[in-house]
Amino acid sequence: MALSREETARRYGTAIFDFAKDSGKTELMYSELTELKKAVQAEPRFVQVLSNPVLDAKQKKSLLTAVEQGFSAELQEVLNFLLSYDRFDNLVDIIDYYIHLYNAANHIGTGVAKTVLKLDEDQLQRLADSYAKKYGLQALHLENEVDPEIIGGVVLEVEGRVIDGSVKHRLEKIRAMLTK
């Protein structure tokens, strides 16, 4: 029975996290996997080629060897492992699960800040630091989404929690109070 994408990501992501933990390289693996994910998203053909059943294992290995030279021995071992089990089509999902485990182990949150105007890096970082401090996180990685419908303010969505500080939400609350 074939594994679902989610189950494959969970199993392999957990195995990679355990491997990195045992070798004391979780942070190094995190940074390298994050960089690899960015590269793969910028050039998705890389995964398509290494997942292509038409290419034989020797061709795939030579392509991978050319790419992995800038990475640590541990990540090279992981990439060769994934290649040997034909799991490169799940690479981004596996990396995402590793990042999820790393963030959970290090009390790092991820989320989205919706605003009317794009926040600069300093504003986004101050917002993330404030939220992290309030909710006991070591750090918070926020992405900024522009949503003109909120009129003003900020809507934070972090780890399943929503804090709606938007003008739209405040107006809806006032409208509800007035109609009672």
From Swiss-Prot:
A Pfam match is OSCP
> NAD: is it a keyword of this entry?
no
Listed GO CC annotations? plasma membrane; proton-transporting ATP synthase complex
Compartments in which it is found: Cell membrane
* Membrane topology (UniProt): Peripheral membrane protein
Keywords from UniProt, A to Z, are: ATP synthesis, Cell membrane, CF(1), Hydrogen ion transport, Ion transport, Membrane, Transport
Write down the NCBIfam families for this protein, in alphabetical order. ATP_synt_delta
Q: Which proteins does it associate with, and in what oligomeric form?
A: F-type ATPases have 2 components, F(1) - the catalytic core - and F(0) - the membrane proton channel. F(1) has five subunits: alpha(3), beta(3), gamma(1), delta(1), epsilon(1). F(0) has three main subunits: a(1), b(2) and c(10-14). The alpha and beta chains form an alternating ring which encloses part of the gamma chain. F(1) is attached to F(0) by a central stalk formed by the gamma and epsilon chains, while a peripheral stalk is formed by the delta and b chains.
Function as written in the Swiss-Prot or TrEMBL entry? F(1)F(0) ATP synthase produces ATP from ADP in the presence of a proton or sodium gradient. F-type ATPases consist of two structural domains, F(1) containing the extramembraneous catalytic core and F(0) containing the membrane proton channel, linked together by a central stalk and a peripheral stalk. During catalysis, ATP synthesis in the catalytic domain of F(1) is coupled via a rotary mechanism of the central stalk subunits to proton translocation.
Protein name in the entry: ATP synthase subunit delta
Gene name, please?
atpH
